[in-house]
């Protein structure tokens, strides 16, 4: 009589175990976690996500500080001067360390070899397969950009082309006040500050953005209603 009881219990056990299995991969992650790490593109996008959201303060601080110093240097000096100073600084460090290790080895009469041997032996060659993969990924974005440019300049959609014209008109005023390097500095400050501020005050920001979106949508609809070509297309 023990066998039937075991048989009756086994389906419930198997069903409970089978019900527990799907919950493991589908379990919701933390709110700030980056989704889907299945592919290389997802992992790279998640790395950028973690970088601009200051998940690793040391790593983000290093990237932010280095790029900011580079941009400030380019604002004060020419590109040739900045690149030359960077190469000189790097060579000063490596040559000094090479001489220092050679002197230490001569004094101690040791044969540790080249101090950078581990890095010299690293294989940094780019395979043809990897090159083609990068080129294919780049071509997707290039083709998409070309299609968008053709659409805008050949006025496939009048509203989109007018938006571009207004944006470019505003950029003429921005260009009169700021140069390219200044805009890059401002862009970097925004990239490394806006996401973390948005994450902290998401509810309030979404509320005001929704109001602004509704106002913009109503204005665009009024403009479209006054344009005969677009009104006719909508009626059709």
From Swiss-Prot:
GO biological process, any: negative regulation of amyloid-beta formation
Principal location: endoplasmic reticulum
Segments of this protein annotated with the region Interaction with FADD: 191-236
Positions bearing Phosphoserine: 30
Domain Reticulon: 48-236
Protein's organism: Pongo abelii (Sumatran orangutan)
Transmembrane stretches, start-end: none
Subunit organization: Homodimer. Interacts with RTN4. Interacts with BACE1, BACE2, BCL2 and FADD. Interacts with ATL1 and ATL2. Interacts with TMEM33. Interacts with ZFYVE27 and with KIF5A in a ZFYVE27-dependent manner. Interacts with RIGI. Interacts with TRIM25.
Low complexity: compositionally biased ranges: 1-24
Any one cellular-component term (Gene Ontology): Golgi apparatus
Alphabetized UniProt keyword annotations: Acetylation, Apoptosis, Endoplasmic reticulum, ER-Golgi transport, Golgi apparatus, Membrane, Phosphoprotein, Transmembrane, Transmembrane helix, Transport
Encoding gene, per UniProt annotation: RTN3
Protein name: Reticulon-3
């Amino acid at each position: 009589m023990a066998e039937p009881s075991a048989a009756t219990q086994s389906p419930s056990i198997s069903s409970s175990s089978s019900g527990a299995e799907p919950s493991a991969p589908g379990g919701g992650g933390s709110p700030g976690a980056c989704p889907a790490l299945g592919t290389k593109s997802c992992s790279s996008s998640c790395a950028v996500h973690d970088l601009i959201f200051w998940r690793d303060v040391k790593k983000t601080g290093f990237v932010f500080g280095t790029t900011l110093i580079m941009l400030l240097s380019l604002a004060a000096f020419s590109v040739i001067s900045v690149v030359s100073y960077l190469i000189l600084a790097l060579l000063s460090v490596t040559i000094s360390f090479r001489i220092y290790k050679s002197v230490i080895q001569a004094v101690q009469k040791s044969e540790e070899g080249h101090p950078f041997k581990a890095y010299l032996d690293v294989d940094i060659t780019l395979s043809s397969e990897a090159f083609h993969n990068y080129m294919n990924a780049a071509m997707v974005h290039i083709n998409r950009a070309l299609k968008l440019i053709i659409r805008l300049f050949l006025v496939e959609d009048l509203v989109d082309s007018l938006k571009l014209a207004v944006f470019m008109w505003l950029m003429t005023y921005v260009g009169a006040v700021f140069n390219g390097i200044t805009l890059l500095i401002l862009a970097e400050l925004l990239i490394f500050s806006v996401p973390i501020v948005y994450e902290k005050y998401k509810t309030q920001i979404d509320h005001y953005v929704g109001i602004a979106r509704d106002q913009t949508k109503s204005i665009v609809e009024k403009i479209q209603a006054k344009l005969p070509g677009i009104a006719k297309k909508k009626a059709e």
